[in-house]
């Protein structure tokens, strides 16, 4: 049985304090007034809160709202998750689109499911005319991402965490015009769950979120609580720090991009008297994710050390970063 439209709930969503926070998040991400957006809802507390708060914004014309949910079929409860989304959507008077995935078991299931979910969401967004897909990633998710990136030596860009907006990561035809927008990055997990309680909307619990045998699970349940015990509010402050890191990385990358020649190489003279951070950024941009952390830093040091001796630094796939007397360039793998 589908729930009836609940006008009192919609009014409560309009008046909830976090609705204004979501609106500011949309504005920061460049979502214009009246834009049609689709919330990616899983049935969990985070996306249910975003769905409800966006319904409040839609009620006074800030956005046009559609909800998309994907039954990935990996857990037996996933169909119930989608049903929960549909029930909440009916109470809010919001159209809910659903897709079911048919994934074979085997290696790489999590990655394949993530890719297929984005493809399904993109397909639904294109179907309903949405220009953005809204994800409910919040400040806690952001800090988890930043800490894992820091531990892996991901560079300034990685330490900045998730951007507020980016192209949707899939290859669905037409999806190149879709944006993935994260309006909740300055909000905590606790505040979004609290909004669900305040509004009286039902959500589903995903037991995999309680796992402590994965890198993200360890960071979520062990590392972040320890950080909060040392410095209360660390999660919220880290989200702002991530924004600063991303802005700093944009400045560095724009500088390096301006230094590159038509063939993609960079003159070493451009690094004369420049901080090593600029050389490190150049290595990150040239090598992308094809070089380990220690080699990246060795290459960055070689760029600025003044030596004219040619040196080569290996990259995955057989390519290499070449630091010669006068230039820095990537040499492709030889057959």
Tell what function each PLM region has.
Residues 193-243, 247, 326, 332:
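Mid-to-C-terminal catalytic subdomains of enzymes
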Residues 2-221:
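Core alpha/beta nucleotide-donor-binding catalytic domains of modification enzymes
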Residues 2-46, 58, 66, 72, ...:
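AMP-forming adenylation/ATP pyrophosphatase catalytic core
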Residues 151, 228, 287, 291:
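Hydrophobic/aromatic-lined pockets within catalytic cores
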